[in-house]
Curated annotation (Swiss-Prot):
Record-listed N-acetylserine modification sites: 2
Family: Belongs to the small GTPase superfamily. Rab family.
GO cellular component terms listed in the entry, alphabetical order: cytosol; endosome; Golgi apparatus; Golgi membrane; mitochondrial outer membrane; mitochondrion; recycling endosome; trans-Golgi network
Activity regulation, free text: Alternates between an inactive form bound to GDP and an active form bound to GTP. Activated by the guanine nucleotide-exchange factor (GEF) TRAPP complex, and inactivated by GTPase-activating protein (GAP) GYP3.
Quaternary structure, from the entry: Interacts with YIF1, YIP1, YIP3, YIP4 and YIP5. Interacts with TRS130.
Name of protein: GTP-binding protein YPT31/YPT8
Classification via InterPro entries: P-loop_NTPase, Rab_GTPases_membrane_traffic, Small_GTP-bd, Small_GTPase
Source organism of the structure: Saccharomyces cerevisiae (strain ATCC 204508 / S288c)
UniProt entry keywords in alphabetical sequence: Acetylation, Autophagy, Golgi apparatus, GTP-binding, Lipoprotein, Membrane, Nucleotide-binding, Prenylation, Protein transport, Transport
Residues bearing a lipid moiety (S-geranylgeranyl cysteine): 222-223
Compartments (UniProt record): Golgi apparatus membrane
Gene Ontology process terms (BP): autophagy; early endosome to Golgi transport; exocytosis; protein transport; vesicle-mediated transport
Further comment found in the protein's record: Present with 5955 molecules/cell in log phase SD medium.
Length: 223
């Protein structure tokens, strides 16, 4: 029986988290990739929200469930729940703000502490449209990504440059890990929650088996 017989419109569901300092453009990257929208009056995200987009890889429908949260210190309490079950992560910085790039070390460390070692990770230098204000050299970021085995792309949520590429490369990397069994089948059933990568009416695909816990997004006020 196919997934369509159960009312699902996908074969696999991947949980991906966006991390990085507040104001680097995480919310607009999310809305650009999932809805092809950009909000010029973007404000810092309050709480957590997610959006989805479905892609096809090797004839399989992959639904990416992408989570976004604010980067301010006062929201660090949600860290463990936010990362739990994630099979992919994108660390985002603003190419015109060196401090946001310097803090990528912190975000990577926090990810490593809260997620499995096999989680697929990409580094995004956002706001490439502000090249005239560049404070972070591309080569420096490339070197950091190579040293830490991260995917790397510079993007512009404003004009869409490389946004699809960044997300699609990460999703493809996750799919390859699943195909090579670097990510194991857990015991949880897919129910639309945030428990990682899952198959309709079947076991959750996650880096390590996790209990079936329902996660809810709080304060869905993102721009």
């Amino acid at each position: 029986m196919s997934s369509e017989d159960y009312g699902y419109d996908y074969d696999l569901l991947f949980k991906i988290v966006l991390i990085g300092d507040s104001g680097v453009g995480k919310s607009n990257l999310l809305s650009r990739f999932t809805k092809n929208e950009f909000n010029m009056d973007s404000k810092s995200t309050i709480g957590v929200e997610f959006a989805t987009r479905t892609l096809e890889i090797d004839g399989k429908r992959i639904k990416a469930q992408i989570w976004d949260t604010a980067g301010q210190e006062r929201y660090r309490a949600i860290t463990s729940a936010y990362y739990r079950g994630a099979v992919g992560a994108l660390i985002v910085y603003d190419i015109s703000k060196s401090s946001s790039y310097e803090n990528c070390n912190h975000w990577l460390s926090e990810l490593r502490e809260n997620a499995d070692d096999n989680v697929a990770v990409g580094l995004i230098g956002n706001k490439s449209d502000l090249a005239h204000l560049r404070a972070v050299p591309t080569e420096e970021s490339k070197t950091f990504a190579q040293e830490n085995q991260l995917l790397f792309t510079e993007t512009s949520a404003l004009n869409s440059e490389n946004v699809d590429k960044a997300f699609e490369e990460l999703i493809n990397t996750i799919y390859q890990k699943v195909s090579k069994h670097q990510m194991d089948l857990g015991d949880s059933s897919a129910n639309g929650n945030a428990n990682g990568a899952s198959a309709p009416n079947g076991p959750t695909i996650s880096l390590t088996p996790t209990p079936n816990e329902n996660k809810k997004a709080n304060g869905n006020n993102c721009c």
